[in-house]
């Protein structure tokens, strides 16, 4: 059967828990702009007004107590599993080089110029619908190897037209997406982007190129930049491959944020690795970031933000999920499954179950959505 792409009835309860827990800005999981291109099982798709009532309920719940709720909008490009999609598209017909990934993805078809224009339009349409539904902002997903990230990367974008070649041409797509969203939502509606600091791959998107994108978006008036990094092939967004010095400092991408801050004044958010009030306060006091992005700590404790704001010397209990079976422990999908089930518990009005087993969580999620689909479940930041 085709995947269910409607907003489920339970996000209001989940996002209400975070709003009541003191979080000032919640950014949704990625909402897709085209139901023909799904990145993960159960993606919500917003391309028309058919589910506006559910979206309005979601927005109302997530905005309780003055919380901002921004919709993250996305297109997966070639990171669209074959189990969910008949074909995949990308800037160029470049397949994954990793043989483990090749088994789960089609070789992508290169987008035509007309199709690129349609995707730009779709980003704008989804943003306008999010505003109509009551969300207080939107975020372009320009990181983690999805379509916007693919256009930016010379490893994946080998076009020879106005959208490829030079770094300036490769950032044309993201700038057109931003301009179209801004045109549709107006100047007073927050628009942000989640952007890779780098792809961490040979021949990929570099830090210097990323800084140039930041400067171009800043000149256009973007409201917030969230810094992340990595792709399916080099998943730094999950904390893999980080140096010990980086782990001690907590935030994965703080050094890059300091470079950004030296060039632009746009507000920055760093997500990934923050665990303690002390580490967050240090990052803010250093001026490297303006907002602290949290993910896994808010799954274990939806009220963690309230504890921080109350002045408690709070440290999140986030820790690696281990079974003792090396092959299982090295698979990022086990931790993704574990946190997915905790989110489902919160959405049902239950407390997170911190002592839930990793292997049992993996098997349960595999049973619910199918093993093949699970294999390509998204790696989530921290």
Language model feature labels by segment:
Residues 1-382:
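Flavin-dependent oxidoreductase catalytic cores
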